[in-house]
Amino acid sequence: MLAKRIIPCLDVTGGRVVKGVNFVELRDAGDPVEIAARYNAQGADELTFLDITATSDERDLILPIIEAVASQVFIPLTVGGGVRTVEDVRRLLNAGADKTSFNSAAIANPDVISQASAKYGAQCIVVAIDAKRRQGAEVAERGEGWDVYSHGGRKNTGLDAVQWAVEMARRGAGEILLTSMDRDGTKSGFDLQLTRAVSDAVGVPVIASGGVGNLDHLADGVQQGGADAVLAASIFHYGEFTVRQAKERMRERGIPVRL
């Protein structure tokens, strides 16, 4: 069994790391370069850097910050937010990213995933899916399940999250970064039903995201959700736990990790 990965996530806006609840109510968590260096030192397996307002602000990639982060980090770095084209992938890889994450652009133009994967390889193409459980009338109309949201969680695309994950993997995504919008920042644990549904449906690794409040939640994402990697922000940013503590807890629960 391959080692399961722990991935701290840096949500960045205005050049600062922030953290919110259900994608809003953002509070400052610090300087991205300093925080990235700290996680690198703590033994994180990878880092994910998301420019969370690039798409909604129609801004370009923040390459200088990405270069500064990459210079401090000697583990795989995934960068997302505002990634729109195959050319953007080239620019990010040149700036020091190891993987690039598409979200809204993949919804607008699914061919970009096929093209980027063909050019640079599936191993550096991640598709991020922000999913929200259907409620009320949506359930009556379309049945139980989850919809995909774009533009930083502001727009319901009407796409089914599980079907979309399958389509993205088919087109060449090497990994799915799956965030439960319902759980984001709530500290109540991953949406394990969502994680399991997507993990069971695709043949590529799934990174569970959204809702981690304690170390057991990380282990649950792997053991109950079927995730290959688990992503967290709040519990690490504000010093509640270190990556090392997270790995030790996962090992206690019988999950293979790199210590």
From Swiss-Prot:
Against SUPFAM superfamilies, the record matches this protein to: Ribulose-phoshate binding barrel
**Catalysed reaction(s)?**
5-[(5-phospho-1-deoxy-D-ribulos-1-ylimino)methylamino]-1-(5-phospho-beta-D-ribosyl)imidazole-4-carboxamide + L-glutamine = D-erythro-1-(imidazol-4-yl)glycerol 3-phosphate + 5-amino-1-(5-phospho-beta-D-ribosyl)imidazole-4-carboxamide + L-glutamate + H(+)
BP GO annotations:
L-histidine biosynthetic process
The listed locations are: Cytoplasm
Q: Which superkingdom, per the lineage? A: Bacteria
Active-site residue list = D11, D130
> What would be an example GO MF term here?
imidazoleglycerol-phosphate synthase activity
Kind of enzyme, top EC level?
A: lyase
The UniProt keyword set, sorted, is:
Amino-acid biosynthesis, Cytoplasm, Histidine biosynthesis, Lyase
Which pathway does the record list? Amino-acid biosynthesis; L-histidine biosynthesis; L-histidine from 5-phospho-alpha-D-ribose 1-diphosphate: step 5/9
Q: What is its EC number?
A: 4.3.2.10
Tell me the InterPro entries matching this sequence: Aldolase_TIM, His_biosynth, HisF, IGPS_HisA/HisF, RibuloseP-bd_barrel
A Gene Ontology CC term for this entry? Answer: cytoplasm
Where primarily located?
cytoplasm
| UniProt similarity note | Belongs to the HisA/HisF family.
Q: What does this protein do?
A: IGPS catalyzes the conversion of PRFAR and glutamine to IGP, AICAR and glutamate. The HisF subunit catalyzes the cyclization activity that produces IGP and AICAR from PRFAR using the ammonia provided by the HisH subunit.
| Assembly notes | Heterodimer of HisH and HisF.
The protein's name? Imidazole glycerol phosphate synthase subunit HisF
The organism encoding this protein is Acidovorax ebreus (strain TPSY)
Gene name of this polypeptide: hisF
